[in-house]
C-alpha cells in the first residue's frame, strides 16, 4: 500500500498545507532551528502600503538589506493569524503617542520624557539588547532578574516588540515577560500587548493559554478589534471556524465592528476547517462585500492558498478572475499561489506562463516562486526543465534550500532513480550545509519503500532519530507501507508499535495499512484487536478493509464478530443495507449479503444502479451466477418497474467484468435498451467505454448512435472516447465533426489530446492538408497550438514524406515557440527517412547542432533504425561506433536491432562479436536475439552452432517460444533429420505452442526426401483434420513426394483433394502430376494430362511437354519422345533448356553409342547442336561457345543452367570425355553455376561440398579436388587440418545418390575416407592418412583427367540402386555386397574388387570363417574370465 496523497504527494511544495497540525508544529521547530535568521516579510501588511490615502507612516524604517525569502511554499506563506497580528501591530504604532506610561522605578540610565522615548532612534538596539539578554538565560534563571535590573529604559511599545521578538524563539520566555509586566503593574494590559502575546501563543499552538489570557483581558480591552483579531488568529491556526465565528458575533454584540483583517482571519479559519467546496470562495467573498468591506490581496491570497492546498484548479481560476474583475492588484503571493496550484494540477505550461507574466508585471520572483515552478516541472518528471529552472534560480542568487532539495529528491523518487535521490540527500547534508528535515526523510523513506529497499529505508529512519528529528506520522506510515509492500509483516508491526511508543497517534491511514497487513497475513485475531482500537479512536476502515475483515472472519467462522462488524458499518459508518450488502458480497459472505439486500428492498429502499452493479459484479467475479439470477428474480418481483434498470444493470455488470460479448448480446437482444425504449446514459457510456477499452470500435460507434438517438446528452468523456474511436476506424473527418459539435454545446477542449489524435489520424490517411486545416482553425479561434499539436502536425507531414513542410513547422516553433523538443527533432528526421533521403540525414543533424540542439540518443537510434531498415550495414556500424564514442551506452533495444540486422545480412562474425559485447555489458541476451542467431545459423547451414545456441537458451533459463521451435524444426529438416524435428514439434505442442504452416511444410518435405512417406502423409492428414486452409504449395509438396515414390494414384487423389478444397490447379500442378506418371513408368497417362491441358484455354509452355517427353525417354521409348518433340515444334513452341536437359540426361544414361547419337541428332534437327558437336571430336574448340551458352542459361530461372550443366557433365563422364568435362565444370564455376568453394585446398581448410551436383559432375569435382590435395601433400603447403570433410548429402539427383556414387569411387581406390559416425551425408578422412594415401597409392599416380581417343561404343557408367558406378566394377560390387553386406572398409573393398571372381569367393569365405572363429574365441575367453572370477572369490572364503 502507498502512503496517502495528502501525506506524501507534494512534500516539497507545501509543508504546512499537506501535514496535520502536529506535523506543522514539528516543521515549525525544524524551521526555527535551521533557518532562524531567515524571516519572511510581507510589504502589503504595512498600513502605509495598504491604505496610502491615509498618509500613514511606520514608526521605524524598513531594513535596507535584502530580505531573504522563506523556505516554505506559497501556501505556507498564506497570511494567517500571526501575520494579522503583525499587521495590527503596525497600525497600533500610530497610537503610541496617546498611551500613558506606567509607573517606573527610579533607576534609569537616562531620564527621558514620553515624547523623547517615542522619538528615540535607538529603540531597535534596546529591543535587541533586552531580547538577547532574556534568550541567553539558562533554564534555572528567570526573566524577572533581567527586567528588574532595569538595564535599559523601555516604553510600552518597546515591551510589545520584546514580547514578539522573544516569542519567535520561546513562547515560555515571552509569557514570562508578559506576566512580569502584569505582576509589576509596569503598565496596564493594553490591546497591543494582549494582541502580541496572543499572536505568540497562537504560533506555538498554545491555545488553552491564549484563551485564558484573552478571557482575563477581555473586560479591559475587549472592545478593541485587534484583540479579537489576534484571538481569531489562534483559532484559525487550528481550523476552529466555529470558535472564530463566535468571536465575530461577540464583537458585533459589543459594538466592535469587524474590519477586513477580521474577515480575512475568519476566512482562513473556515478554509482550514475543511476543504474548499464548490462556490465556497464566491460565498466568502460575498460575505466580505456584504459587510461593506472590499476584499484585498490578503483575502484573495488566502482563498488561492486553500485552492492550492486542495489542488482545486477551477476554484483558483474563479478566485483569480474575480480578483482581476474587481481590480484588486495581484501581488507576488498571488502569483506564487497560482503557480503552485497549476503545478499541483499538472499544468506546468500554465505555471511557466504565469511565471513569465509575473516578471513582465514588474515583480521579482523569490525562492517560493522558483520552488513552486520547480515543483511543477518535477511533478511532470521533466528533468530538463527542472535543471533549467534551478540554473535560473541560481543566477538570481537563490541557492538550494530545503524545499528545493525536497522537490528534486521527490522527483527522482517518483522516477525510480533512487540512487540520484540518495546522492542529492548526501549533497544536501555535506556540500550545501542544509539540514534535511522531516519531509526530506519522509520522501526518501517512502520512495525506498515503494522500491522494496526497506533496509535502506529503515536505516534512514534510524539516522533521522540520531540527528534528533522526530519522525512524523507520515514518516511512520511510509515505512509501514514499505514493509507492507515487501511482505515484511513483522517489521511493519514493530514499526507500528514504535510509533505508538513514541506518542504519535495513528491516523486513519496508519490504522488502515496495519489492518491490511494483518488481514492479508491471515492474522485475523490481531487485526480484530487493532480494529477495535481504531474504532475507539474515532476512525473507521474503508469498504475494502471491511471486505478483507469479513473475509478473514468468514474463514475462521467467527459469526458473532461478523455481526458486530455489520452493526459497526451501520451505526458508525452510516452504511445503508445496500452498501452493507455490497461489502458482504465482496467479503464472500453471500447469505448475509442477500439478506441485507432483501431487507433494503423490503424496507422501500430504491434500487440504485451503482449499488446493484456492485453486488452483481461481486457475484459474477466469485462465479456464483445462480445466486445472481435468483437475486434478479427477487428484484423483478419486489422492485416494481425495474425491468429496464435490471437489464441495464446486467449490461453494465458484464462490462465491469469485461465480458463485452455478453453485454453486447444483452444489449442488442432487449428492445427495452436497444430500440425505441431508450436506456440510461450510464448504461450507454459504460458500454461504450468498454467497447473502446476492448478495441471494438464498430460496436462503440453503434452504441454512440443509439445514445444520440435516445436524446441523451453525450458527456465530455464520451466525446473524447468517440474521437478516439473514429480516429482508430480511420474516419478523422467524423472525429473532427464530433469535436465541433461538442464545442458548440459548451465543452472546451483547448489544445487537448483529441486534436492531436485527429491530426495523427489525418496523417495516417495521408491527408496532411486536412491536418494542416485543424491547426489553422485552432489558431484562428485564438487557441495557441501547444507542443503536442505542433509535433502531431509534423508527424502528419512525416507520414506523407513532406520533409519541407515539417521543416517549416520546425522553424515556426523555433521562431514563435514552443521550443522544439527531442520528439520534434525525431519527427523531423523521420520525415526525411520516409521521403527516402537518408543521405541527407547527416546534413540535417549538423544544421541542428549548429542551432544549439544536442542530438539525443533517441535521434541517433532513429537514424540507425532507418539505415537498418534499408539494410545498410556499413552506415549502421558507423553510427553505432560514433554513438559509443560520444558516450551513449547501447541499450537492449539497440543491441537487438543491430544483431537482427547483422543476422539478416549473414554477418556471422559481427553478430557473434555483438552478442559477446552485450554479455560483457551485463545485458541479458533476450530470446528474440537468440532467435535471430538461430535463423542466421540455419540460413548458412551451420547446424552445429544452431544447436549450441539452443543449448545456451536453455542454460540461461529462457523459455523457447514459437519462433525458436519453428526455426529448430526447419534446421532439422534441412539437416535431413526430420525425426528429431518431429519430436521437437511434439514437445512444442505439449507446451501449448502451435507450429507455423511453413514448419509443417518443411517437415513434410523433409520426410519425403528421406522416403518416410507414412510420416509425411500423417502430417498432411493431420493438417486437413484440423480444418486448416492449406495453400497450393502443400499439395505440390505432397505431389512431389508421390512423384518420387512412383505412386501416380496418390498424385491423382491429391489433385482431386486440391480441387475439392477450392484451389484451382496451375500449370505447375499438372506438371507435377505428369512427372508422377513418368516416375511410375506411365508416359501415356502423362500424355493424356497434356491433351486435357490443350483442350483448356491455358497458355502452354515447354514445361508440360518436357514432362511428357521425359516420361518417354525414362522408359527408353526414344522414338516416342522424339515424336512429341517434333509435335511441339509443329505447334509453334520453340524447344528451350528444359527439352535440351531432358535429351542430354537421357543420353547420359543410354547404354549404347547409337542411342546417344539418336537423341543428340534429334536436338541437332531442332537447332541445338552443341552436345553432339562436343562428342564428335575436338571439343576444345568450343570453349567460348559453351561459355556463351552458360551465360545465357544463368539468367534463366528454375535452375536452368545448373540442370543443363549437370546433365552435360554426366554425359561427358559416361562416354569418357573427362578432360572436356573438367573444363566444362570449371566454366560452370566461373559463371557462378557451381559454388566457388565447391572444394577447397587452403591453409588448414581442406574440404568439399558436392551437394547440388550430378553424379558425373561430382566425379569430376572429386578428381580435381584429389589432384589439388595431392599437390599440397607433395609441396607441404597449404597445410591441412586435422581431418578433411567431404559433404555428399543424402538426397538423390535424378535417381543418382551422391553419397553412394562417391563411396563406390573412393572405396574402389582404397581411400581413407570413412562415413561420419554422427551425421549422415558426410565422409571424413584423417589428414595424415589422406596425405600418405595421395602420395603412395597407385590409384593416385595419375589423377589427370583425359579424353578418350575415340568415343566408346557403350556407356562406361551404370546406375545400380542409385549408385552411378563404373560398369566394369558392377559384378564385383554386387558380389561383395551380396556376400558381406553391411559396411566394408575401403581398403578391403579395393583389395577384393581387384581379385578374379573365384579367388574373391575364396577370400570372402576365409574372411567369414575367420570372423566366426574370432567371435567364438572371444566368447570362450569371456566365459573363462567369469569362471576365474568365481574361483577368486572362493579363495578368500573362510572355512568353518
From Swiss-Prot:
Residue spans of the PPR repeats: 224-258, 259-295, 296-330, 331-365, 366-400, 401-431, 437-471, 472-506, 507-541, 542-572, 608-638, 643-678, 680-714, 715-749, 751-785, 786-820, 821-855, 856-890, 891-925, 926-960, 961-995, 996-1030, 1031-1065, 1066-1100, 1101-1135
Family annotation (Gene3D superfamilies): Tetratricopeptide repeat domain
GO-annotated molecular function: RNA binding
SUPFAM superfamilies referenced in this protein's UniProt entry, alphabetically: TPR-like
Cited Pfam families: PPR (PF01535), PPR_2 (PF13041), PPR_3 (PF13812), PPR_long (PF17177)
Signal peptide (from-to): none
Subcellular location, principal: plastid
Assigned keywords, A-Z: Chloroplast, Plastid, Repeat, Transit peptide
Region annotation Disordered: where it falls in the sequence: 63-84, 1419-1440
One GO location term (cellular component): chloroplast stroma
Superkingdom to which the source organism belongs: Eukaryota
Listed GO biological process terms: chloroplast RNA processing; embryo development ending in seed dormancy
Polar residues composition-biased segments: 63-72
Span of chain positions assigned to the transit peptide in the UniProt entry: 1-44
Localization per record: Plastid, Chloroplast
Similarity annotation: Belongs to the PPR family. P subfamily.
Role, per record: May play a role in embryogenesis.
Protein name: Pentatricopeptide repeat-containing protein At3g18110, chloroplastic
Organism classification: Eukaryota, Viridiplantae, Streptophyta, Embryophyta, Tracheophyta
Amino acid at each position: 500500500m502507498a502512503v496517502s496523497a495528502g501525506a506524501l504527494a507534494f512534500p516539497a511544495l507545501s509543508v504546512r498545507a499537506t501535514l496535520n497540525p502536529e506535523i506543522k508544529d514539528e516543521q515549525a521547530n525544524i524551521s526555527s532551528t535551521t533557518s532562524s535568521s531567515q524571516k519572511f516579510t510581507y510589504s502589503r501588511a504595512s498600513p502605509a502600503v495598504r491604505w496610502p490615502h491615509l498618509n500613514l507612516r511606520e514608526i521605524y524604517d524598513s531594513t535596507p538589506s535584502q530580505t531573504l525569502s522563506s523556505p516554505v511554499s506559497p501556501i505556507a506563506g498564506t497570511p494567517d493569524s500571526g501575520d494579522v497580528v503583525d499587521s495590527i501591530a503596525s497600525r497600533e504604532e500610530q497610537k503610541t503617542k496617546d498611551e500613558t506610561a506606567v509607573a517606573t522605578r527610579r533607576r534609569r540610565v537616562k531620564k527621558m520624557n514620553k515624547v523623547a522615548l517615542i522619538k528615540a532612534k535607538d529603540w531597535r538596539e534596546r529591543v535587541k539588547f533586552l531580547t538577547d539578554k532574556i534568550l541567553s538565560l539558562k533554564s534555572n534563571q528567570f526573566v524577572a532578574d533581567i527586567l528588574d535590573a532595569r538595564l535599559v529604559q523601555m516604553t510600552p511599545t518597546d515591551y510589545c516588540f520584546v514580547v514578539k521578538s522573544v516569542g519567535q524563539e520561546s513562547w515560555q520566555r515571552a509569557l514570562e515577560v508578559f506576566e512580569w509586566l502584569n505582576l509589576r503593574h509596569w503598565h496596564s494590559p493594553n490591546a497591543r500587548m494582549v494582541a502580541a502575546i496572543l499572536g505568540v501563543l497562537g504560533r506555538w499552538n498554545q491555545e488553552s493559554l491564549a484563551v485564558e489570557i484573552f478571557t482575563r483581558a477581555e473586560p479591559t480591552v475587549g472592545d478593541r478589534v485587534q484583540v479579537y483579531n489576534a484571538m481569531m488568529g489562534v483559532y484559525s491556526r487550528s481550523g476552529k471556524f466555529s470558535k472564530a465565528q463566535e468571536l465575530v458575533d461577540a464583537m458585533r454584540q459589543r459594538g466592535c465592528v469587524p474590519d477586513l483583517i477580521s474577515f480575512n482571519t475568519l476566512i482562513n479559519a473556515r478554509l482550514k476547517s475543511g476543504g474548499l467546496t464548490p462556490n465556497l470562495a464566491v460565498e466568502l467573498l460575498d460575505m466580505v462585500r456584504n459587510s461593506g468591506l472590499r476584499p484585498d490581496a490578503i483575502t484573495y491570497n488566502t482563498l488561492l492558498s486553500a485552492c492550492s492546498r486542495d489542488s482545486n484548479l477551477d476554484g483558483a481560476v474563479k478566485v483569480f478572475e474575480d480578483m482581476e474583475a474587481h481590480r484588486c492588484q495581484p501581488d507576488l503571493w498571488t502569483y506564487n499561489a497560482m503557480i503552485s496550484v497549476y503545478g499541483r494540477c499538472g499544468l506546468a505550461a500554465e505555471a511557466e506562463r504565469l511565471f513569465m507574466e509575473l516578471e513582465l508585471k514588474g515583480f521579482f520572483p523569490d525562492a517560493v516562486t522558483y520552488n513552486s515552478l520547480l515543483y511543477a516541472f518535477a511533478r511532470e518528471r521533466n528533468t530538463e526543465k527542472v535543471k533549467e529552472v534551478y540554473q535560473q534560480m541560481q543566477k538570481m542568487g537563490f541557492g538550494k534550500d530545503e524545499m528545493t532539495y525536497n522537490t528534486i529528491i521527490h522527483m527522482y523518487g517518483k522516477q525510480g532513480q533512487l540512487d540520484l535521490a540518495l546522492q542529492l540527500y548526501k549533497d544536501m547534508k555535506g556540500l550545501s550545509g542544509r539540514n534535511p528535515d522531516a519531509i526530506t526523510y519522509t520522501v526518501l523513506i517512502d520512495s525506498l519503500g515503494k522500491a522494496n529497499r526497506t533496509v535502506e529505508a529503515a536505516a534512514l529512519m534510524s539516522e533521522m532519530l540520531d540527528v534528533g528529528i522526530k519522525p512524523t506520522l507520515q514518516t511512520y506510515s511510509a515505512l509501514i507501507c514499505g514493509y507492507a509492500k515487501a511482505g515484511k509483516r513483522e517489521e511493519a508491526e514493530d514499526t507500528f508499535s514504535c510509533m505508538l511508543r513514541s506518542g504519535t497517534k495513528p491516523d486513519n491511514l496508519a490504522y488502515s495499512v496495519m489492518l491490511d497487513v494483518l488481514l492479508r497475513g491471515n492474522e485475523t485475531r490481531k487485526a480484530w484487536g487493532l480494529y477495535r482500537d481504531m474504532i475507539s479512536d474515532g476512525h473507521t476502515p474503508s469498504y475494502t478493509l471491511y471486505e478483507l475483515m469479513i473475509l478473514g472472519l468468514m474463514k475462521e467462522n467467527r459469526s458473532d464478530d461478523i455481526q458486530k462488524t455489520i452493526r459497526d458499518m451501520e451505526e458508525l459508518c452510516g452504511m445503508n443495507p445496500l452498501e452493507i450488502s455490497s461489502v458482504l458480497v465482496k467479503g464472500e459472505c453471500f447469505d448475509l449479503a442477500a439478506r441485507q439486500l432483501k431487507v433494503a428492498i423490503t424496507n422501500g429502499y430504491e434500487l440504485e444502479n451503482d449499488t446493484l452493479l456492485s453486488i452483481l459484479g461481486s457475484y459474477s467475479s466469485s462465479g456464483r451466477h445462480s445466486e445472481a439470477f435468483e437475486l434478479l428474480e427477487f428484484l423483478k418481483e419486489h422492485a416494481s418497474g425495474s425491468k429496464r434498470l435490471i437489464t441495464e444493470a446486467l449490461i453494465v455488470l458484464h462490462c465491469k467484468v469485461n465480458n463485452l460479448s455478453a453485454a453486447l448480446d444483452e444489449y442488442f437482444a432487449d428492445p427495452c435498451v436497444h430500440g425505441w425504449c431508450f436506456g440510461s446514459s450510464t448504461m450507454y457510456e459504460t458500454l461504450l467505454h468498454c467497447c473502446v477499452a476492448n478495441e471494438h470500435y464498430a460496436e462503440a460507434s453503434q452504441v454512440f448512435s443509439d445514445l444520440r438517438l435516445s436524446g441523451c446528452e453525450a458527456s465530455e468523456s464520451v466525446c473524447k472516447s468517440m474521437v478516439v474511436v473514429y480516429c482508430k476506424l480511420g474516419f478523422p473527418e467524423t472525429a473532427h465533426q464530433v469535436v465541433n459539435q461538442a464545442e458548440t454545446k459548451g465543452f472546451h477542449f483547448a489544445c487537448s489530446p483529441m486534436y492531436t489524435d485527429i491530426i495523427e489520424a489525418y496523417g495516417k490517411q495521408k491527408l496532411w492538408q486536412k491536418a494542416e486545416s485543424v491547426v489553422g482553425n485552432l489558431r484562428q479561434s485564438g487557441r495557441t497550438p501547444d507542443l503536442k499539436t505542433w509535433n502531431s502536425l509534423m508527424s502528419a507531414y512525416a507520414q506523407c514524406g513532406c520533409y519541407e513542410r515539417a521543416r517549416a513547422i520546425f522553424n515556426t516553433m523555433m521562431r514563435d515557440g514552443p521550443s522544439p523538443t527531442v520528439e520534434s527533432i525525431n519527427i523531423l528526421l523521420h520525415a526525411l527517412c520516409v521521403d527516402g533521403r537518408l543521405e541527407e540525414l547527416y546534413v540535417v543533424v549538423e544544421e541542428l547542432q549548429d542551432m544549439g540542439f544536442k542530438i539525443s540518443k533517441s535521434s541517433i537510434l532513429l537514424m540507425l533504425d532507418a539505415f537498418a531498415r534499408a539494410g545498410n550495414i556499413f552506415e549502421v556500424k558507423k553510427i553505432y561506433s560514433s554513438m559509443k564514442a560520444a558516450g551513449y551506452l547501447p541499450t537492449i533495444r539497440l543491441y537487438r536491432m543491430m544483431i537482427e540486422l547483422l543476422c539478416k545480412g549473414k554477418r556471422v562474425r559481427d553478430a557473434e562479436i555483438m552478442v559477446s559485447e552485450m554479455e560483457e555489458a551485463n545485458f541479458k541476451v533476450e530470446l528474440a536475439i537468440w532467435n535471430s542467431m538461430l535463423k542466421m545459423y540455419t540460413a548458412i547451414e551451420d547446424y552445429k552452432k544452431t544447436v549450441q545456441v539452443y543449448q545456451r537458451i536453455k542454460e540461461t533459463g529462457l523459455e523457447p517460444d514459437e519462433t525458436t521451435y519453428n526455426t529448430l524444426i526447419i534446421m532439422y529438416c534441412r539437416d535431413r533429420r526430420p525425426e528429431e524435428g518431429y519430436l521437437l514439434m511434439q514437445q512444442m505442442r505439449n507446451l501449448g505452442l502451435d507450429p507455423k504452416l511453413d514448419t509443417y511444410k518443411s517437415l513434410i518435405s523433409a520426410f519425403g526426401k528421406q522416403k518416410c512417406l507414412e510420416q509425411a502423409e500423417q502430417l498432411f492428414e493431420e493438417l486437413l483434420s484440423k480444418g486448416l486452409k492449406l495453400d497450393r504449395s502443400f499439395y505440390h509438396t505432397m505431389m512431389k513426394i508421390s512423384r518420387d515414390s512412383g505412386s501416380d494414384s496418390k498424385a491423382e487423389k491429391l489433385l482431386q483433394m486440391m480441387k475439392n478444397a477450392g484451389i484451382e490447379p496451375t500449370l505447375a500442378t499438372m506438371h507435377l502430376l505428369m512427372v508422377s506418371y513418368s516416375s511410375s513408368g506411365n508416359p501415356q497417362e502423362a500424355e493424356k494430362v497434356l491433351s486435357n491441358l490443350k483442350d483448356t484455354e491455358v497458355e502452354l509452355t515447354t514445361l508440360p511437354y518436357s514432362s511428357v517427353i521425359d516420361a518417354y525417354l525414362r522408359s527408353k521409348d526414344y522414338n516416342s519422345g522424339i515424336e512429341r518433340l517434333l509435335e511441339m515444334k509443329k505447334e509453334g513452341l520453340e524447344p528451350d533448356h528444359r527439352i535440351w536437359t531432358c535429351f542430354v540426361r537421357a543420353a547420359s544414361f543410354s547404354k549404347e553409342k547409337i542411342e546417344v547419337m539418336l537423341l543428340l541428332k534429334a536436338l541437332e534437327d531442332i537447332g541445338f547442336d552443341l552436345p553432339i558437336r562436343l562428342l564428335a571430336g575436338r571439343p576444345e574448340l568450343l570453349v567460348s561457345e559453351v561459355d556463351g551458352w552458360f551465360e545465357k542459361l544463368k539468367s534463366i530461372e528454375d535452375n536452368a543452367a545448373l540442370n543443363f550443366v549437370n546433365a552435360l557433365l554426366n554425359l561427358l563422364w559416361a562416354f569418357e570425355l573427362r578432360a572436356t568435362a573438367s573444363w566444362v565444370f570449371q566454366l560452370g564455376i566461373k559463371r557462378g553455376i557451381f559454388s566457388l568453394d565447391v572444394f577447397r585446398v587452403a591453409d588448414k581448410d581442406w574440404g568439399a561440398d558436392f551437394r547440388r551436383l550430378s553424379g558425373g559432375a561430382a566425379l569430376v569435382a572429386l578428381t580435381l579436388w584429389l589432384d589439388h590435395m595431392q599437390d599440397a601433400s607433395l609441396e607441404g603447403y597449404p597445410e591441412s587440418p586435422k581431418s578433411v570433410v567431404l559433404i555428399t548429402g543424402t538426397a538423390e539427383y535424378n535417381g543418382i545418390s551422391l553419397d553412394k556414387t562417391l563411396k563406390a569411387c573412393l572405396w574402389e581406390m582404397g581411400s581413407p575416407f570413412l562415413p561420419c559416425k554422427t551425421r549422415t551425408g558426410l565422409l571424413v578422412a584423417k589428414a595424415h592418412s589422406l596425405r600418405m594415401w595421395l602420395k603412395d597409392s597407385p590409384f593416385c599416380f595419375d589423377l589427370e583427367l583425359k579424353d578418350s581417343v575415340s568415343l566408346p561404343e557403350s556407356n562406361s557408367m551404370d546406375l545400380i540402386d542409385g549408385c552411378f558406378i563404373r560398369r566394369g566394377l558392377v559384378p564385383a560390387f554386387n558380389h561383395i555386397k551380396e556376400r558381406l553386406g553391411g559396411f566394408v572398409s575401403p581398403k578391403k573393398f579395393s583389395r577384393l574388387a581387384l581379385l578374379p571372381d573365384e579367388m574373391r569367393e575364396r577370400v570372402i569365405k576365409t574372411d567369414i570363417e575367420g570372423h566366426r572363429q574370432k567371435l567364438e574365441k572371444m566368447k570362450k575367453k569371456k566365459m573363462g574370465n567369469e569362471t576365474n572370477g568365481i574361483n577368486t572369490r572362493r579363495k578368500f572364503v573362510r572355512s568353518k
